[in-house]
From Swiss-Prot:
Protein name: Methylcytosine dioxygenase TET3
UniProt GO cellular component terms: chromosome; cytoplasm; female pronucleus; male pronucleus; nucleus
Zinc listed as a keyword: yes
Subcellular localization, as worded in the UniProt entry: Nucleus; Cytoplasm; Chromosome
Keywords: Chromatin regulator, Chromosome, Cytoplasm, Developmental protein, Dioxygenase, Disease variant, DNA-binding, Intellectual disability, Iron, Isopeptide bond, Metal-binding, Nucleus, Oxidoreductase, Ubl conjugation, Zinc, Zinc-finger
Underlying gene: TET3
PANTHER family (UniProt xref): METHYLCYTOSINE DIOXYGENASE TET
Species this chain originates from: Homo sapiens
ZnF bounds (CXXC-type): 50-90
């Protein structure tokens, strides 16, 4: 219709006509989606000049608006190239004519209301196309028009003439005003225009019907289904009867006939389940529908005409004809096409009675006579006045697609289409349509009443009603909730305009509908535009094509509006008309609804509206432009259109107008319009031509011809701008053949597309695009951007875009409001473009102002004090991060509280280049006295006590540098810094609260079962949250408000005891060094509030403590002036210490031996380890005797075995140990079962060891804190956190279990001296044996000494932590140890590993193997012992001793067993390889060898000792767990573990092993992960005996290390390893030597003044507020972190995103799980059907990562089973292991595979 308008507009001679074009402009210009109102102002002004891009007035509010809203579709979908809806020039949005008309049609508030509504709707919906006001208005305006028409629906007759011209010609403000104008506009001029419009509408309808046949067909079929299920329903209902009739009418005869033809030609409805090429019931139903429609049409149409002239079809037909004629005269083509011809064509094509056809024509004429709405109708009328009327509904949908064109037609089309539509929608659309129509207008009743209503006014009124209803409807749609209400509204409104309403139903479909439809359509369109700017653009293209039917398009909008607008008009026949109309619009509204929501009910039309997205897409078509549909697509579209009885579906579901495929896409995007969507599908499914032809196969070609002829005539008369096919074309295609007509029209449209009015045909969808429409929004530039692309491929492009827009914009904008929350940059002219990269992140919820002084005022007002109480510091964003060479946090400037007078510190950033209202923003607020001192003191003590004992450290990526190699938290797992999270936080898994599936979430969960402690913690945090919230509200009210928005809804996810709960979670960081990061998961516009608690020595103002933690902003530097611009004052601050300018930031470089593993890696390893652990356990069960033997050999050392296990666990820790004492400690502890440690660093090192362990859960490096309780680890639980010493190897910390340390110690010793390491291990083992026996690493300290003492008790008696310390410190002792090691001690070393195995005395036994091993390693047994060989020897001794001589023979010990002489070198590597995978071998030979050899040892496991070793290792190795276990266990306490401990643990004392391992996360499981890498390191540390050890370290590959250790063993690496170990330790920064050697000043940061590093020194009880999501922040590492007595506890309160569901989102989760369960069940059924095995089925059905892993591992287990021949000792291992050593050396695969 819009297109019609445009063409009309082209003719300046015809004011009314031009008014129409203006209106058309509305339709086709930017303002309206595709409605005339959408026409650009130029169109308004220039009539046909719609294509020209009009200029912004520059004076209206939108023009003066400088910033984009960011929420509209134009903003969100930049591809549309549309200006922000809120910035769209009002002038461009409105057509001059439209405005006038709007004024004329004040009744409905057409112009203003429509515009406003449109704009509003557009804004609300994020107009898709161009400026909200313009295009949006266009769409919405139509709504307004529709309403205005509705309001003036009654007056339509009277006002029709004036309104008609106004609508047609006055079209500037066509959208809303047009319809009113219709009423007011002069009849003649308007009539002419109306006729043109009607022709265009008819053409549009035809094209649309054709293009939307699929949609129509789908709708019809749906209606059919509905009716079959509830036969009487739609068609027969009273009020609905009207709609039902409309349904029938709505599904015009053309539609029904088209559907019938398609059905007969084998084009079954999309949803048809019938077998065979046809759907008998459907055919029968269609035939019956057609008959009823014809009957109904005869009656209704007469009624329609009745309102115009008589009340009968005959009269209406004549009336319509006259109107048409008048219109035609204006539009020569139309005149050329006699009404009778149209009637005949309609009757023929639609298979309706001539009387009905005449009635339709009469209505069309009436519509023509009426203002533009009438014109619109006439247009439809011309081809098939009434027939088109049914298409009006159809068009209405189309108008949704391309509202401008269809809206006009839809009214008429609705009427004439009512029968066809009815025929078509009855399946589905009808019901929907009826409801929709009900909303819009009752088609049946309208028809009946139409004749009764004033003929002239009625059509106009009807159009108006349609528009009104449509606009209401659209509005409703926009407000989705209103959708249904809109329907009712439509009914009510329709009744409101009784006179118009009665005819309105028919007219709305026919004449009135066109006018109202465009308006309604525009509104709907606007809504849709908002939702789918791009789609709308495409639609606009279509609309522009349909431009001719500008009036028609308004009609289409009427259809949209009918829900609301028609209400006023349909008062007289609200029920029937509504219903009938609903059915007709059902195609559109319903279709739209279907498309968008996928709802089928007729009422859904409103629903469709609700689903503004889908609808938007459809209206988008009309508003932006009628999409140019290609000829081929035209048939498809037609088909769709035909299928959906009403063109409305097509227009409504823009897709319908588009080519079938695009249409489908559109429909898919807007499934809410069932009819539309299905029609689209239908359109696609059947051939386009078929779709066109179904209604009247014969007429279809004629329709094409007629359309072309009409187009030519229109073109000739109105210029290309009027590229609207003649009325005949419309009639032909109108009802069913609207599609038919459309095909031809499509071509014509396509042909005209280049002109002012673009007639684009896609299948059944004909889009008349007026550049006006686009112009308004920047014309085609704005909307066309999308539209044009679609225009080129037309359907294809459009569909693609709409789909994309539906999927993307609709989905992302509507479905994901998350982005809507994202604030946009304030609009300012300060800089051309805001680049956060240069000026820093932009946000203002902490506060902002034009100057720093304004910030002071702001903060003084908030805080309530002035002067010195408020301190403001300026910082400058440089973007250069200050960090140490290792990537750890540093500070260059420290801002401290200078005096007690200072209460509030505020850091502000001046945005470079800005002088606007937000030139200065607050980035940090620090209240020095945030909480009472007493509360702070109490909290510090309570939290320290509780978390030290029961805390379960959280693994955080920010705890490590980018390389994951730093140990900033410290290396002692028991004391290293750690963070503990409580409360609710966002989970990627749930995309919501992590407690989504927790029936009874423990928000303050501690390790183990400690409800009392948890309650204490809960109370502490709840009280604190309650205390802090008011301060937060006072200091950052906006951020606070943002965080309490959803408090009531998600109260379960909030902390605090009083109303006003901004926080959801809290993280307690105890001496935790957070590396530079942003809290990405925080609420977008929220903040983190950090409460700081400091140690007793740091609670005074002005005193700088020895150690402190600073909060750093790494990207900022201090300004050289103070807040007042004084450089002197700033210098004075520096001099007084208020600002401390650092020249260096010396910090010990603490480094992990190997990079910490990522959570993903840990998880994968944990899974593997768990799987292997199970295997190992099974193996243990299978070889319990051997294990027992080993245990027995370890005998008295049973506890030792436990310790060994622990040691093994700890061994994993060894890895870190290599780096530093803490490493050793850590390693030991970690493997001791420190999940955190393992998972963190060691885990990284020993992939197998931690896989199962809890550690895997932690991202911390091995060095990172282990759970204080270590309750996870059975053994560790006894000892408090210190006992565990999870993380690191705080060599200095004897707290670490000595046992762990022991192993770790020997590991350290390895560091210091390879030999020492092993001896250390030995001693540790001895010590650990008991310790492990004790199962408490905490006891390890003393026991650790024994462990060391075990062999080197004196050796490194570093005391309790000799292990770790020795690692680091006792280099000499280590060497000494090494010496010993070579001797018995070496054996012992191995022994202590082995010691557990009771083979410490097996030097000879081992010696033999050792030499082998050594040989392999390139060492003599003693050398080996001393180097790694020493331990090897020791191991050998142990191995040999305890073992199985064969195994021993093969390997020195269990581990050596692995190495059995035969396979020693190769085997070790082999096993190492395997183990390597498990990390065992890589650990050091001392332990690692054990682990490795245990690989063989596992075979050797048959030996008591060997088996112990082997088996323990086996578990590690075999189960991956074995390897891991062995690795970690061996590493930390690998030897003990490997030898007897492990043995005992695995077999003899599985409990211990479990305990140890359990804490580790699996007896061997955990160890393996840590073991591999840690073992390696441990080996290095210890063993570094393998000169390669270090290499291994360097490689950090468990495998490599495993190999290296052996290799090292091969080669003398004793000293080098020691050095390496030391070095590593140093690297770790754990060793004292390391500390001395590895200190860094981060000098490079201080050489460049632009490198950032502004830090604040938070005081005790202070509250710091910052936007952690946007600002990069960090906390500096402490010199001596000790979470048992933390230097600083920072309690970080935050609220993560998406925590806005009640009960943590449990309902959503359960629903999701139910769905997944159903899917899984389906998969299982499918698997069963396919005959897949259980495992295969699992893999096939669900991706349980376990499935593949478990399956694969079991296979490996089988191999292991063979390896269980591990028990076969050397024999199988010799050949197989050798091969496997290399062939199977895999970092990822557990050695257990081969064991």
């Amino acid at each position: 219709m819009s297109q019609f308008q445009v063409p009309l507009a082209v003719q300046p001679d015809l004011p009314g006509l031009y008014d129409f074009p203006q209106r058309q402009v509305m339709v086709g210009s930017f303002p309206g989606s595709g409605l005339s109102m959408a026409g650009s102002e130029s169109q308004l002004r220039g009539g046909g000049d719609g294509r020209k891009k009009r200029k912004r007035c520059g004076t209206c509010e939108p023009c003066r608006r400088l910033e984009n809203c960011g929420a509209c579709t134009s903003c969100t979908n930049r591809r549309t190239h549309q200006i922000c809806k809120l910035r769209k020039c009002e002038v461009l949005k409105k057509k001059v004519g439209l405005l006038k008309e709007v004024e004329i049609k004040a009744g409905e508030g057409a112009g203003p209301w429509g515009q406003g509504a449109a704009v509003k709707t557009g804004s609300e919906l994020s107009p898709v196309d161009g400026p909200v006001p313009g295009q949006m208005d266009s769409g919405p305006v139509y709504h307004g028009d529709s309403r205005q028409l509705s309001a003036s629906g009654v007056p339509v007759n009277g006002a029709r003439e004036p309104a008609g011209p106004s609508l047609l010609g006055t079209g500037g403000p066509w959208r809303v005003d047009q319809k009113p104008d219709w009423e007011a506009a002069p009849g003649p001029a308007h009539t002419a225009r109306l006729e043109d419009a009607h022709d265009l509408v008819a053409f549009s309808a035809v094209a649309e019907a054709v293009s939307s046949y699929g949609a129509l067909s789908t709708r019809l079929y749906e209606t059919f289904n509905r009716e079959m299920s509830r036969e009487a329903g739609n068609n027969s209902r009273g009020p609905r009867p009207g709609p039902e009739g409309c349904s029938a009418g709505s599904e015009d005869l053309d539609t029904l006939q088209t559907a019938l033809a398609l059905a007969r030609h084998g084009m079954k409805p999309p949803n048809c389940n019938c077998d065979g090429p046809e759907c008998p019931d459907y055919l029968e139903w269609l035939e019956g529908k057609i008959k009823s429609v014809v009957m109904e049409g005869g009656e209704e149409r007469p009624r329609l005409p009745g309102p115009l002239p008589p009340g009968e079809a005959g009269l209406p037909a004549p009336s319509t004809r006259p109107l048409l004629s008048s219109e035609v005269p204006q539009i020569s083509p139309q005149e050329g096409l006699p009404l009778s011809q149209s009637a005949l064509s309609i009757a023929k094509e639609k298979n309706i009675s001539l009387q009905t056809a005449i009635a339709i024509e009469a209505l069309t004429q009436l519509s023509s006579a009426l203002p533009q709405p009438s014109h619109s109708t006439p247009q439809a009328s011309c081809p098939l006045p009434e027939a088109l009327s049914p298409p009006a509904p159809f068009r209405s949908p189309q108008s949704y697609l391309r509202a401008p064109s269809w809206p006009v037609v839809p009214p008429e089309e609705h009427s004439s289409f009512a029968p066809d539509s009815s025929a078509f929608p009855p399946a589905t659309p009808r019901t929907e349509f009826p409801e929709a129509w009900g909303t819009d207008t009752p088609p049946a009743t309208p028809r009946s009443s139409w004749p009764m209503p004033r003929p002239s006014p009625d059509p106009m009124a009807e159009l108006e009603q349609l528009l009104g209803s449509a606009s209401d409807y659209i509005q409703s749609v926009f407000k989705r909730p209103e959708a249904l209400p809109t329907k009712p509204k439509v009914k009510v409104e329709a009744p409101s305009s009784s006179p118009a309403p009665a005819p309105s139903p028919v007219l709305q479909r026919e004449a009135p509908t066109p006018s109202s439809e465009p308006d309604t359509h525009q509104k709907a369109q606007t809504a849709l535009q908002q939702h789918l700017h791009h789609k709308r653009s495409l639609f606009l293209e279509q609309v522009h094509d349909t431009s001719f039917p500008a009036p028609s398009e308004p009609s289409a909008p009427g259809w949209w509006p009918p829900p609301s607008s028609p209400v006023p008009r349909l008062p007289d026949r609200p029920p029937k008309e509504k219903k009938k109309k609903l059915p007709t619009p059902a195609g559109g509204p319903v279709g739209t609804e279907k498309a968008a929501p996928g709802i089928k009910p007729s009422v859904r039309k409103p629903i469709q509206i609700k689903k503004s997205r889908p609808r938007e897409a459809q209206p988008l078509f009309p508003p932006v432009r009628q999409i140019v549909l290609e000829g081929l697509r035209s048939p498809a579209s037609q088909e769709v259109q035909a299928h959906p009885p009403a063109p409305l579906p097509a227009s409504q579901g823009s897709a319908v107008p588009l080519p079938p495929e695009p249409s489908l896409a559109l429909f898919a995007p807007s499934p809410s319009r069932d009819s539309l969507l299905p029609p689209t599908q239908e359109m696609r499914s059947p051939s386009p031509m078929t779709a066109l032809q179904p209604g009247s196969t014969g007429p279809l070609p004629p329709a094409d011809d007629k359309l072309e002829e009409l187009i030519r005539q229109f073109e000739a008369e109105f210029g290309d701008s009027f590229g609207l096919p003649g009325p005949p074309s419309v009639p032909i295609q109108d009802p069913e053949n609207q599609q038919t007509c459309l095909p031809a029209p499509e071509s014509p449209f396509a042909t005209r597309s280049p002109k002012q009015i673009k007639i684009e045909s896609s299948g059944a969808v004909t889009v008349l695009s007026t550049t006006c429409f686009h112009s308004e929004e920047g014309g085609q530039e704005a909307t066309p951007t999308k539209a044009e692309n679609p225009l080129t491929p037309t359907l294809s492009g459009f569909l693609e875009s709409p789909l994309k827009y539906l999927d993307t914009p609709t989905k992302s904008l509507l479905d994901t409001p998350a982005k809507r929350a994202q604030a946009e940059f304030p609009t300012c002219d300060c800089v051309e473009q805001i680049v956060e990269k240069d000026e820093g992140p932009y946000y203002t919820h902490l506060g902002s102002g034009p100057t720093v002084a304004s910030i002071r005022e702001l903060m003084e007002e908030r805080y309530g004090e002035k002067g010195k109480a408020i301190r403001i510091e300026k910082v400058i964003y440089t973007g250069k991060e200050g960090k140490s060479s290792r990537g750890c946090p540093i500070a260059k400037w420290v801002i401290r509280r200078h005096t007690l007078e200072e209460k509030l510190l505020c850091l502000v950033r001046h945005r470079a280049g800005h002088h606007c209202q937000n030139a200065v923003i607050v980035i940090l607020i620090l209240a020095w006295e945030g909480i009472p001192r007493s509360l702070g003191d109490t909290l510090y003590q309570e939290l320290t006590d509780t978390l030290r004992k029961y805390g379960n450290p959280t693994s955080r990526r920010c705890g490590l540098n980018d390389d994951r190699t730093c140990a900033c938290q410290g290396k002692d797992p028991n004391t290293c810094g750690a963070s503990f999270s409580f409360g609710c936080s966002w989970s990627m898994y749930f995309n919501g609260c992590k407690y989504a599936r927790s029936k009874t979430p423990r928000k303050f969960r501690l390790a183990g079962d400690n409800p009392k402690e948890e309650e204490v913690l809960r109370k502490s945090f709840q009280d604190l949250a309650t205390e802090v919230a008011p301060l937060y509200k006072r200091l950052a009210p906006q951020a606070y408000q943002n965080q309490v928005t959803n408090e009531e809804i998600a109260i379960d996810c909030r902390l605090g005891l009083k109303e006003g709960r901004p926080f959801a979670g809290v993280t307690a960081c105890m001496d935790f060094c957070a590396h530079a990061h942003k809290d990405q998961h925080n609420l977008y516009n929220g903040c983190t509030v950090v409460c700081t608690l400091t140690k007793e020595d740091n609670r005074c103002v002005g005193k700088i403590p020895e150690d402190e933690q600073l909060h750093v902003l790494p990207l900022y530097k201090m300004a050289n002036t103070d807040e007042f611009g004084s450089e002197e004052n700033q210098n004075a601050k520096v001099g007084s210490g208020a600002i401390q300018v650092l020249t260096a930031f010396p910090r010990e470089v603490r480094r992990l031996p190997e990079p910490a593993k990522s959570c993903r890696q840990r998880q994968l390893e944990a899974r593997k380890a768990a799987a292997e652990k199970k295997k190992i356990q099974k193996e243990k069960l299978s070889t319990p005797e051997k294990i027992k033997q080993e245990a027995l050999e370890l005998a008295g050392i049973t506890s030792d075995p436990g310790l060994s296990l622990k040691g093994g666990l700890s061994q994993q820790g060894l890895k870190p140990s290599l780096k530093v004492e803490p490493q050793n400690h850590f390693s030991s502890f970690k493997y001791s079962g420190n999940a955190v440690v393992e998972s963190y660093s060691v885990l990284g090192n020993c992939r197998p060891s931690d896989p199962y362990s809890m550690n895997s859960v932690y991202s911390y490096h091995s060095y990172y804190a282990q759970p204080s309780l270590t309750s996870v680890n059975g053994f560790h639980s006894k000892y408090a956190l210190p006992s565990f010493s999870y993380y690191g190897f705080p060599s200095s910390n004897p707290v670490f279990p000595s046992q762990f340390l022991g192993p770790g110690a020997w590991g350290h010793s390895g560091s210091s001296g390879s030999f020492e390491k092993k001896p250390d291990l030995h001693a540790l083992h001895n010590s650990l044996s008991p310790a492990y026996g004790g199962a408490e690493f905490a006891e390890l300290p003393s026991q650790a000494v024994p462990t060391d003492a075990h062999h080197p008790t004196p050796h490194h008696q570093q005391p309790a932590y000799p292990g770790p310390k020795e690692y680091l410190l006792p280099k000499a002792p280590l060497l000494h140890s090494v010496s010993r090691d070579p001797s018995p001690f070496a054996q012992s070393s191995n022994c202590y590993n082995r010691s557990i195995k009771q083979e410490p005395v097996d030097p000879l036994t081992q010696a033999e193997p050792v030499p082998r091993d050594a040989g392999k390693m390139g060492k003599t047994p003693l050398s080996e012992v001393s180097q790694n060989g020493g331990p090897s020897h020791l191991w050998g001794q142990y191995s040999g001793g305890p073992s199985m001589s064969p195994k021993r023979t093969n390997g020195v010990g269990g581990s050596w067993g692995v190495f059995s002489s035969g396979e020693s070198p190769a085997i070790v590597p082999d096993k190492l390889s395997s183990f390597g995978a498990s990390c065992l071998a890589p650990s050091h030979f001392t332990d690692g060898q054990w682990g490795l050899f245990p690989g063989e040892g596992q075979q050797a496991a048959s030996h008591s000792g060997g088996r112990l070793r082997g088996k323990p290792w086996s578990p590690c190795k075999f189960g991956n767990s074995t390897s891991a276990l062995a690795g970690p266990s061996l590493t930390e306490k690998p030897w003990a573990l490997g030898a007897g401990d492990f043995n005992s643990a695995l077999k003899g004392s599985p409990g211990f092993q479990d305990k140890l391992w359990n804490p580790m996360k699996g007896e061997e499981g955990r160890i393996p992960a840590a073991g591999a890498s840690q073992l390696d390191r441990a080996w290095q540390s210890f063993g570094l005996p393998l000169g390669s050890s270090e290499k291994l370290f360097g490689a950090l590959k468990s495998e490599e290390k495993l190999w290296d250790p052996f290799s090292l063993e091969e080669g003398p690496a004793e000293e080098p390893p020691s050095k390496g170990a030391v070095k590593e330790e140093k690297g770790g920064g754990g060793a004292e030597e390391e500390e001395e050697e590895l200190w860094s000043d981060s000098e490079h940061n201080f050489l460049d003044e632009n490198i950032g590093g502004v830090a604040v020194a938070p005081a005790h009880g202070s509250i710091l507020i910052e936007c952690a999501r946007r600002e990069l922040h960090a906390t500096t590492p402490l010199k001596k972190p000790n979470r048992c007595h933390p230097t600083r506890i920072s309690l970080v309160f935050y609220q993560h995103k998406n925590l806005n569901q009640p009960n943590h989102g449990l309902a959503l989760w359960e629903a999701k799980m139910k769905q997944l369960a159903e899917r899984a069940r389906a998969r299982q059924e499918e698997a069963a059907r396919l005959g897949l095995g259980q495992q295969e089925a699992k893999l096939y059905g669900k991706k349980r990562k376990w499935g593949g892993t478990v399956v694969a591992e079991p296979q490996q287990k089988e191999k292991k089973g063979v390896v269980p021949t591990r028990q076969a000792l050397a024999v199988p291992t010799d050949s197989a292991v050798t091969v496997s050593s290399y062939a199977y050396t895999k970092v990822t695969g557990p050695y257990s595979r081969w064991i």
